[in-house]
Amino acid sequence: MSAKSSNLVSVGRITAVYGIKGWVKVHSYTEPQDNLFEYHPWWVKTRHGVKQVEIDEARPHGDAYVAHIKGVDDRDLAMAYTAADIAVERDLLPELEDGEYYWNQLEGLSVFTVFGGEQRLGVVTKLLETGANDVLVVQGDAQSIDQRERLIPYVPGQFVLSVDLDSKRILVDWDPEF
């Protein structure tokens, strides 16, 4: 079986090898973090391409996890998976309520503000988790009012007025001078 790259969603990253028996250190992007191990199979994006792997054992280790990839039984084999993104097929992710979005759905959307008349601020390049609320990182581009990077709190109803995935836009109430 193969998965199209467009159907894959990054859910974590293999950061390093762990020990000599083929274990790897894993950083999870899921919330809660151990949800990462509920998804099967993993598609690992290495410098050699995308490969399907199965995890046969995993456990917490510090602020991350360590995992064993089935069939990878020594440190040298595990080394080939370091610095690799972990992805799963999009349809494995739980359905969200109306008005809720996965971060990867928001990345790449154009952001417009209604402050002082509709103006393009740029494109969402990533999101940050701050504890209080998530933050959109919006980078200005050739079509926006300037090239600045802006950090806009993702607070629906207050700063984020609407998200339209079909038209690939987010409408915000945000002063462009901030």
From Swiss-Prot:
Domain of life: Bacteria
GO molecular function: ribosome binding
GO biological process: ribosomal small subunit biogenesis; rRNA processing
UniProt keyword Cytoplasm present: yes
Domain PRC barrel: 98-178
A Gene Ontology term for the protein's cellular component: cytoplasm
InterPro entries associated with the record: PRC_barrel-like_sf (IPR011033), PRC_RimM (IPR056792), RimM (IPR011961), RimM_N (IPR002676), RimM_N_sf (IPR036976), Transl_B-barrel_sf (IPR009000)
Keywords associated with the record: Chaperone, Cytoplasm, Ribosome biogenesis, rRNA processing
Chief location of this protein within or outside the cell: cytoplasm
Subcellular locations according to the entry: Cytoplasm
Pfam families membership: PRC_RimM, RimM
Subunit structure, interactors included: Binds ribosomal protein uS19.
NCBIfam families from the UniProt entry: 16S_RimM
Family membership: Belongs to the RimM family.
Stated role: An accessory protein needed during the final step in the assembly of 30S ribosomal subunit, possibly for assembly of the head region. Essential for efficient processing of 16S rRNA. May be needed both before and after RbfA during the maturation of 16S rRNA. It has affinity for free ribosomal 30S subunits but not for 70S ribosomes.
Domains: entry comment: The PRC barrel domain binds ribosomal protein uS19.
Full protein name: Ribosome maturation factor RimM
Source organism phylogeny: Bacteria, Pseudomonadati, Pseudomonadota, Gammaproteobacteria, Cellvibrionales
